[in-house]
């Protein structure tokens, strides 16, 4: 008779073998994560496929197997998360429009536009923060501008529509300049330059997205209201 001792462990069941498709998807995700990190630190021109391969620990030939060239890899890195944040913003703006019962306010529209995105950088982990820093670099490049236009113009125009309805008497150019200042502030925030950390002697931190979320929409809404006050337009907030 065999006695099973308390210290004996039952035999572990063999793990099911991963399919070729699963292994391929895992490899691609590792490559995209590594490329995202490197692009966020050095930009597209400061990174080679060899750099990405070394960070992942694979041969460069595997990079060429999955991606035609560095440009194709960069586009894949950008679009992986761009589709997510675009869908979330559109959903948030649509939900706000339903909730406001046809009476949007500037601050309400800005909260829907900004907070939904900032939440990803608060709770989405370092990958989202790396992608945000990458996004902060794109507007100064031709390839980046094309990607931003493709993915985010519909979101921006959705916000512009709500702002027009919140301030129907505001000059069209003021609405677009207001948006320009909003997105410029957001892109600088996503870049996480660390400059505010130094200037404030550590009082503020450029990666404190919760602090940004608590302030940005209110601050920008005040700017729109100042435009309205000087032009004679009136926000639906009164």
Question: Which role does the model predict for each range below?
Answer:
Residues 1-14, 123, 153-238:
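C-terminal peripheral helix-coil segments that are non-catalytic and often amphipathic
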Residues 24, 28-36:
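Short, leucine-enriched amphipathic alpha-helices that occur as contiguous helical runs
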Residues 30, 38-80:
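Helix-turn-helix
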Residues 78, 92-93, 120-121, 125-147, ...:
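N-terminal/domain-start segments enriched in small and hydrophobic, helix-friendly residues
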Residues 81, 85-93:
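Conserved phosphoryl-transfer catalytic core
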Residues 90-127:
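Hydrophobic alpha-helical connector segments
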Residues 108, 127-133, 142-167:
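Amphipathic alpha-helical packing segments from all-alpha helical-bundle domains
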Residues 113, 117, 132-139, 182, ...:
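Short alpha-helical scaffolding segments that buttress acidic/His motifs in well-ordered protein cores
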């Amino acid at each position: 008779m065999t006695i099973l001792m308390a210290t004996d462990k039952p035999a572990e069941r063999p793990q099911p073998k991963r399919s070729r498709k699963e292994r391929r998807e895992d490899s691609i995700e590792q490559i995209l994560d590594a490329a995202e990190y490197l692009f966020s630190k050095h930009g597209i021109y400061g990174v080679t496929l060899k750099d990405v391969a070394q960070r992942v620990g694979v041969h460069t030939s595997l990079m060429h197997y999955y991606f035609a060239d560095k440009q194709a890899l960069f586009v894949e890195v950008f679009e992986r998360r761009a589709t997510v944040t675009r869908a979330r913003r559109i959903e948030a703006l649509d939900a706000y429009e339903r909730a406001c019962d046809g009476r949007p306010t500037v601050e309400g529209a800005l909260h829907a536009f900004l907070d939904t995105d900032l939440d990803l950088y608060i709770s989405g982990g370092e990958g989202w923060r790396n992608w945000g820093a990458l996004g902060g670099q794109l507007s100064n490049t031709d390839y980046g501008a094309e990607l931003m236009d493709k993915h985010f113009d519909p979101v921006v125009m959705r916000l512009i529509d709500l702002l027009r309805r919140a301030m129907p008497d505001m000059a069209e150019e003021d609405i677009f300049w207001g948006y320009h200042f909003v997105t410029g502030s957001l892109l600088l925030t996503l870049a996480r330059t660390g400059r505010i950390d130094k200037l404030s002697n550590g009082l503020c931190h450029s990666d404190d997205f919760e602090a940004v979320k608590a302030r940005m929409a209110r601050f920008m809404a005040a700017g729109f209201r100042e435009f309205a006050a000087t032009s004679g337009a009136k926000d639906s907030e009164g």
